Swiss-Prot record:
Active-site residues (renumbered): D731 (proton acceptor)
UniProt similarity note: Belongs to the protein kinase superfamily. Ser/Thr protein kinase family.
Enzyme class per UniProt: transferase
Sites bearing Phosphoserine, chain numbering: S735, S764
EC number(s) stated in the UniProt entry for this protein: 2.7.11.1
InterPro entries: Kinase-like_dom_sf, Leu-rich_rpt, LRR_dom_sf, Malectin-like_Carb-bd_dom, Prot_kinase_dom, Protein_kinase_ATP_BS, Ser-Thr/Tyr_kinase_cat_dom, Ser/Thr_kinase_AS
Alphabetical UniProt keywords: ATP-binding, Glycoprotein, Kinase, Leucine-rich repeat, Membrane, Nucleotide-binding, Phosphoprotein, Receptor, Repeat, Serine/threonine-protein kinase, Signal, Transferase, Transmembrane, Transmembrane helix
Modified residues (Phosphothreonine): T770
GO molecular function list: ATP binding; protein serine kinase activity; protein serine/threonine kinase activity
Recorded GO CC terms: membrane
The name this protein goes by in its record: Probable LRR receptor-like serine/threonine-protein kinase At1g67720
Amino acid sequence: MGLCLAQLAVTCLFLVPFVLSQVTEFVSIDCGCSSNYTDPRTGLGWVSDSEIIKQGKPVTLANTNWNSMQYRRRRDFPTDNKKYCYRLSTKERRRYIVRTTFLYGGLGSEEAYPKFQLYLDATKWATVTIQEVSRVYVEELIVRATSSYVDVCVCCAITGSPFMSTLELRPLNLSMYATDYEDNFFLKVAARVNFGAPNMDALRYPDDPYDRIWESDINKRPNYLVGVAPGTTRINTSKTINTLTREYPPMKVMQTAVVGTQGLISYRLNLEDFPANARAYAYFAEIEELGANETRKFKLVQPYFPDYSNAVVNIAENANGSYTLYEPSYMNVTLDFVLTFSFGKTKDSTQGPLLNAIEISKYLPISVKTDRSDVSVLDAIRSMSPDSDWASEGGDPCIPVLWSWVNCSSTSPPRVTKIALSRKNLRGEIPPGINYMEALTELWLDDNELTGTLPDMSKLVNLKIMHLENNQLSGSLPPYLAHLPNLQELSIENNSFKGKIPSALLKGKVLFKYNNNPELQNEAQRKHFWQILGISIAAVAILLLLVGGSLVLLCALRKTKRADKGDSTETKKKGLVAYSAVRGGHLLDEGVAYFISLPVLEEATDNFSKKVGRGSFGSVYYGRMKDGKEVAVKITADPSSHLNRQFVTEVALLSRIHHRNLVPLIGYCEEADRRILVYEYMHNGSLGDHLHGSSDYKPLDWLTRLQIAQDAAKGLEYLHTGCNPSIIHRDVKSSNILLDINMRAKVSDFGLSRQTEEDLTHVSSVAKGTVGYLDPEYYASQQLTEKSDVYSFGVVLFELLSGKKPVSAEDFGPELNIVHWARSLIRKGDVCGIIDPCIASNVKIESVWRVAEVANQCVEQRGHNRPRMQEVIVAIQDAIRIERGNENGLKSSSSSSSKAQSSRKTLLTSFLELESPDISRNSLAPAAR
């Protein structure tokens, strides 16, 4: 015993300096406070956020009776489409506790209490939902920093205004809270409970040198910690406990405990955001003096975790003595929303079970941040006008909402595709790192005060538009400008460039504007003087020949008309003519559709004998052209002006839209009161056919469904962001998602599509669509937005998950539709109840949850709370990576814990397994760490 105490003393000598250094690295921000101060209860210094963040407004709470000085104010942020962020400095690869708190206090003019999103970098941390105005809501993450900073952001208000009360950063020691999965997962603290606590107060710094918050087991919030077994008593000691193990629980926590004097300890604990994979620790220390013939042995009583229940806990034996910590760990366990846990004594034990503390943390998947090279360039650009409002936008440039001056791709990681900083008071040189923004398609830096020469941008092979006019740029024009393969528009007017213009820029392939660069040389212009002189000399001769030339021209025009008439007759005989799409009798410049004569189509379709379906435009027939190309022919004989407008609209739209995930238009015909559209034939029918149609189709496996969802989402995302003006489909449904011969999905049926004007956010129109898919907000307001398509796509995602039709009294009973039914199950944490039985035995639960989560967001009642299609694509791609096992993800260490919640009893243990290397079933038993 003396040796142990000596070792403990020596260890403490080394630990104390480290703990003291920890405190100096604490970051404690009082949001809304106007000045710095020291908390007299803890001795910790708190700083005002007035110099940290420009946005938002401080609010002083009316009730100032709080013991903590930190909860007398809060900072409120606007309810717009921006995010508001605090940046905290970190050391790369070091672990930290990041903690935010929220006390509403009852002030505010909102009709509903606030509900909004909380993000750390690009990862959605939590949905903050205020239900009690006088309760402090705490959100805590354990992270390993991957850079020199982390961003904590609030955004996306559903009701009320986003706000924050405090923000804290606490560095951790050595390998505390290390996991095998920290490259891909944060730890979101779900519970940290001090059993046997002397009062209701939470225990934290200075009693815990790392300032963890240990909640008292006496302070039982509704549904938080209930169900104490009879005979549970509280014990404590003042003796020193050796707590120098991996997680360093505080001494005061280990000096108290609960004991089951009747042989059982039992609790029920609600875990928010569960079911999920979790990391759990139990802390035991024998703090009672046991007699020579007394023993304390017990087991975890948990029927769903037989591997854990087999292990016997003998604290004194496991910890090598009394008053010494034993901390068995459960590094990867799947837990339900409602966790019931019990410890029961073994038959050969004389004493009941004992418990000092527990910690449970959810594995929170880390979302990929925007490409680092892109972010570094954006940061450099922001430093060129640091006091501007646009430069103070924080967090990730692309996720969860875009900065106001960038556009991003939907890839993983996201890449910046557009920088729009016209007239933004930029000063200095263009950052050289811009050459590594390979996804950039548009660069707008005009009307600023840029100086210096153009940096190397030869790697910007996707660049289409570059505007640099009205700056103070100088030097020669680099040769690479003539060799950017996709460059369409380049403007360098009103600068100080000099030297020769690369000849390729003058050949007409690029819209090139370069006026008012006095020292810029154009060889063609140097020859211009002599050309003018020659023309002047020849002018007299031209005047003399004018009359004769006019006569010759008149004759030539007459011959041309006769030739054109003959050519037109000849090409119509062939049945295929290239026309510009027509709207209201006027030619459109944006694209070309092909006119196919009616006889040609009658021959191709065998007089329209093989009907393969019907869409909003009309009946669809199978055809084969003379060259062997298979086509789908959509036809209507209705001569109404409404359908005429619809026909013209669809031809005009599809003539200029080309994307791999949109069904391409091949041609059209308008003869004999028939309006016909000819599309590429899709061999595998529609998604609706496979989910709800003939039994001839083999059930789609989960990975195929995810791939189809991704394809369709990319098609819709292109309509929303890749077209100018953007296009709203407004009839998204599973029967309008067609599958080609390789089972790749393409979105079809643009008969109901609508274009939005560039300066509008919506289109007013009579609500049209399909029952079960129709956005309720659109139906009520008649205001069509891109979020109407997002709602309909959310319904499609629920179809993919469940295999059920959107509307079915048989399937959904009183819920009537798939949205109400699925959301009610998700609220209960029962995603298993949604899964199509055809695929239930062969899916990974985390991928299912990822899709269910984004589908649930898509069908939010209010459009501004729904994600953009770009965010939906990212979520689906996350699910695909999890399903394929390409992430260093988790593998569940337990049987399915959803049995108590799910009505589907056919789900197997493997349903909840997530792949991961180096974890075997032998590692499932509790292990001292």
